[in-house]
């Protein structure tokens, strides 16, 4: 196993060097291809912009932010610390040697506004064992920043990119030769780039949300022993070969929301009140998904998460292709428990892709009422 891990690291380093060599090609070709020219600020102008530091929070919650931009573009400072850690992902004690941004699966949701400059400090503590980087699907050039942020244990890097596109986007680790292993070990998150004037229905109506929740759907691939029991390992490197063998079957053993079966159900349910307008950001970095709110609807849905597009209306289920982030807006109208699921019901009920909303308020008989209670014939 040690030799395999060493070979893997050499492959990663070689790949990183190749990616670095490609960087001038990628960046030099990007400007002319841009369909929407954006004024280029000089280094001096960027240095003079106001700066704002984000205090990120763990999902399903989202840091404090304004829905409309205040003033002009800013430099938004973000720090993401990589943490390799064991996570228990179900009630049976099944473990995964997770790779995470800031210790959670998914990594924190970052919220900025279009045309802000996002300055990310990526920290790989010396307590980790592997090389990592970060690829922002919202960024332009250098493999989403992946070619510029390769950090070994004990290193850090600082990347700045301009958030030119409005929408919800994936970010994930993408070390050369090992991308799927890192992503399916939990190393992904999302960034939401809001339009500077806030969300609309595409026809001029403002869409203001009272709450925003961030759900990360994660597929895990846990090896089994000869008795069919899930195996446990001391480190990610020790688990590597067995995990990749399961990954190649394209058959997850677990598909969960926010890192574990039941992480967002029961006592951990998301909360809302009748009349509250809730934005649900749905994150899946690897597979297609089909969110459905049982008892409710997608009042406005950006299926691929891009706010320049007119949202779909009154959806029962919406399709989010992987790897894409989607967003849905809903005003809760009845109290009770709502199940939010991947409506591939096998994945929801058998593998774990389910969450609950617990909604308080007064019941509306006009929307639903019992005409006759269940009784014998």
From Swiss-Prot:
PROSITE patterns attached to this UniProt entry: TAT
The reaction(s) this protein catalyses: nitric oxide + Fe(III)-[cytochrome c] + H2O = Fe(II)-[cytochrome c] + nitrite + 2 H(+)
Family: Belongs to the multicopper oxidase family.
Domain called Plastocyanin-like: residue spans: 99-194, 259-360
Biological process terms in GO annotation: denitrification pathway; nitrate assimilation
Known pathway: Nitrogen metabolism; nitrate reduction (denitrification); dinitrogen from nitrate: step 2/4
Source taxon at top rank: Bacteria
Subcellular compartments: Periplasm
Cofactor info, note text: Binds 1 Cu(2+) ion. The Cu(2+) ion is held by residues from each of 2 monomers of the trimer. Nitrite is bound to the Cu(2+) ion site. Pseudoazurin is the physiological electron donor for the Cu-NIR in vitro. Binds 1 Cu(+) ion. The Cu(+) ion is bound within a single monomer.
Source species: Rhizobium sullae (Rhizobium hedysari)
Domain remark in the UniProt entry: The type I copper site in NIR plays a crucial role for electron transfer from pseudoazurin to the type II copper site of NIR, which comprises the catalytic center of NIR for the reduction of nitrite.
Keywords: Copper, FAD, Flavoprotein, Metal-binding, Nitrate assimilation, Oxidoreductase, Periplasm, Repeat, Signal
Protein name from the UniProt record: Copper-containing nitrite reductase
């Amino acid at each position: 196993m040690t030799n395999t891990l060493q070979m893997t690291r050499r492959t990663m380093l070689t790949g990183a060097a190749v990616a670095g060599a490609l960087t001038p090609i990628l960046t030099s070709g990007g400007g002319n291809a841009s369909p929407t020219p954006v004024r280029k600020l000089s280094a001096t102008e960027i240095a003079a912009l106001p700066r704002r530091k984000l205090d990120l929070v763990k999902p399903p919650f989202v840091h404090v932010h304004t829905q409309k931009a205040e003033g002009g573009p800013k430099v938004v400072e973000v720090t993401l610390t990589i943490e390799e850690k064991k996570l228990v992902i179900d009630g049976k004690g099944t473990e995964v040697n997770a790779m995470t941004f800031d210790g959670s699966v998914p990594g924190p949701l970052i919220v900025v506004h279009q045309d802000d400059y996002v300055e990310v400090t990526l920290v790989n503590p010396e307590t980790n064992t592997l090389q990592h980087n970060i690829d922002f699907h919202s960024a332009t050039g250098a493999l989403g920043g992946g070619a510029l942020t390769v950090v070994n244990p004990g290193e850090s890097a600082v990347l700045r990119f301009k958030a030119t596109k409005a929408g919800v986007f994936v970010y994930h680790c993408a070390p050369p030769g090992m991308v799927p292993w890192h992503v399916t070990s939990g190393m992904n998150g999302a960034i939401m780039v809001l339009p500077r004037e806030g969300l609309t229905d595409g026809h001029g109506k403002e869409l203001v949300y009272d709450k925003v929740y961030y759900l990360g759907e994660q597929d895990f691939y846990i090896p089994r022993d000869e008795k069919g029991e899930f195996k446990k390992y001391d480190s990610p490197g020790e688990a590597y070969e067995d995990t990749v063998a399961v990954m190649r079957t394209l058959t997850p053993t677990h598909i969960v929301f926010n890192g574990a079966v039941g992480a967002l159900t029961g006592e951990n349910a998301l909360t809302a009140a009748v009349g509250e307008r809730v934005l649900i950001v749905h994150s899946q970095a690897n597979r297609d998904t089909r969110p459905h709110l049982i008892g409710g609807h997608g009042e406005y849905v950006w299926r691929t998460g891009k706010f320049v597009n007119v949202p779909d209306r009154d959806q029962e289920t919406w399709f989010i292709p992987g790897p894409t982030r989607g967003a849905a807006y809903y005003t809760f109208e009845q109290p009770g428990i709502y199940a939010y699921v991947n409506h591939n019901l096998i994945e929801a009920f058998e593998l774990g892709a389910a969450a609950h909303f617990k909604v308080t308020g007064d019941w509306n008989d006009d929307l639903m009422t019992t005409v006759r209670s269940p009784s014998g014939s």
